C-alpha cells in the first residue's frame, strides 16, 4: 500500500512539474532576456507615467509593469520612448508597451493587444474663453490640439468629414503636437482653442494650469479600452499577461490601481 502511495505521489509531483513548465507564465518567462521584462512607454504622460522628484518612473503603467514582472518572476525595465515610435520597438527594444495607449484596429495590425482598463478623452479649454466645447459635435470650426499618433486623430478627421461638413458646418482644424505638454502650451498661448486628452491626464493638466484651463466636455469623448501591446504572434507572453491580470483582479490589486487613478475596469 505504501509503495503504491509513493508511486502515486511521484506521478502527481511529476505531473505538477510538467504542468508548471508548460504554463503561460513559465513559457513567457523563458522568452525574456536575462529575466528582465522590458516595457516601452513615453514618460511624459502623467498619470500614466512620469518621473518623480527622485527621477524614478511612477504612476499607472509602471505599477502594472511591476506587477506583471513579479508574476513572470522577472525584473521590470522601463524604457522611455517617443509615443509615435512605441509600437515599432516591440520585440526589438522591449517585450511590451504599456503607455496609456488605446486599442485600435490600426495598432492591432502591427501588434497584439491585451485590454487592461477603459478610458476616454476630455476636451480642455481656456477657462475664460467663449469657446467651451461640451461634445465632439461642438468642435466644428474649432482649432483642436492633440498629441501626434493618438487614436483621436483619425476619429476627429472622420467626425469632421461625416458630421461637420455634411451638416454645413466648418471643418475641425486638427493640430498635432509631438507631446501632450506641447499641445497644452499651445492652448495656453491661444494658438489653439481646445485640447483633446485622455481623461486622467486631462485632469492633471487642468490642476497644474493654476486656474487657466478647465475641462469643458460633459462626458467622455471616444471611450476605448487601453491595451498592453506585445509582438504579433507572441501568444506565450500575451497569455501570461492575461493570466496575471486575472490574478490581480482576484486579489484586489487591479481594482486598487483602477480606483487610485480614476480609470474604469474592463472584463
Residue ranges and their predicted role:
Residues 29-100, 176, 251, 260:
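Extracytoplasmic small-molecule ligand-binding "clamshell" domains
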Residues 63-71, 129, 137-151, 227-265:
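Extended ligand-binding regions for polar small-molecule ligands
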Residues 51, 65-72, 152-176, 206-210:
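Ligand-binding cleft/hinge of the Venus flytrap
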Residues 66, 70, 75-138, 219-220:
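Acidic, polar ligand-binding/catalytic clefts
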Residues 40-45, 79-84, 93-104, 119, ...:
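Beta->alpha turn/N-cap motifs
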Residues 43, 118-122, 207-246, 261-267:
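Periplasmic-binding protein-like
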Residues 2-14:
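Bacterial N-terminal signal peptides that target proteins for export
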Residues 84-88, 101-109, 155-159, 188-189, ...:
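A ligand-binding cleft/hinge motif common to bilobed small-molecule-binding domains
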Amino acid at each position: 500500500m505504501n509503495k503504491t502511495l509513493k508511486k502515486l505521489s511521484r506521478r502527481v509531483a511529476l505531473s505538477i512539474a510538467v504542468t508548471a513548465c508548460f504554463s503561460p507564465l513559465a513559457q513567457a518567462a523563458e522568452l525574456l532576456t536575462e529575466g528582465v521584462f522590458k516595457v516601452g512607454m513615453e514618460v511624459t504622460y502623467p498619470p500614466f507615467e512620469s518621473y518623480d522628484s527622485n527621477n524614478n518612473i511612477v504612476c499607472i503603467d509602471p505599477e502594472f509593469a511591476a506587477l506583471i514582472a513579479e508574476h513572470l518572476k522577472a525584473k521590470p525595465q522601463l524604457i522611455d520612448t517617443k509615443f509615435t515610435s512605441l509600437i515599432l520597438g516591440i520585440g526589438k527594444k522591449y517585450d511590451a508597451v504599456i503607455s496609456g495607449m488605446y486599442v485600435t484596429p490600426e495598432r492591432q495590425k502591427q501588434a497584439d493587444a491585451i485590454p487592461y482598463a477603459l478610458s476616454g478623452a476630455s476636451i480642455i479649454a481656456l477657462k475664460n474663453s467663449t469657446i467651451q466645447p461640451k461634445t465632439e459635435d461642438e468642435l466644428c470650426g474649432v482649432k483642436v490640439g492633440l498629441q501626434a499618433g493618438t487614436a483621436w486623430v483619425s476619429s476627429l478627421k472622420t467626425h469632421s468629414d461625416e458630421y461637420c461638413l455634411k451638416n454645413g458646418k466648418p471643418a475641425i482644424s486638427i493640430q498635432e503636437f509631438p507631446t501632450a505638454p506641447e499641445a497644452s502650451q499651445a492652448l495656453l498661448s491661444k494658438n489653439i482653442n481646445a485640447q483633446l486628452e485622455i481623461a486622467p491626464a486631462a485632469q492633471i493638466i487642468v490642476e497644474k494650469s493654476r486656474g487657466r484651463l478647465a475641462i469643458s466636455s460633459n462626458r467622455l469623448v471616444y471611450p476605448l479600452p487601453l491595451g498592453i501591446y506585445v509582438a504579433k504572434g507572441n501568444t506565450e507572453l500575451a497569455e501570461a499577461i492575461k493570466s496575471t491580470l486575472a490574478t490581480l483582479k482576484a486579489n484586489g490589486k487591479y481594482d486598487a490601481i483602477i480606483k487610485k487613478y480614476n480609470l474604469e475596469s474592463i472584463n
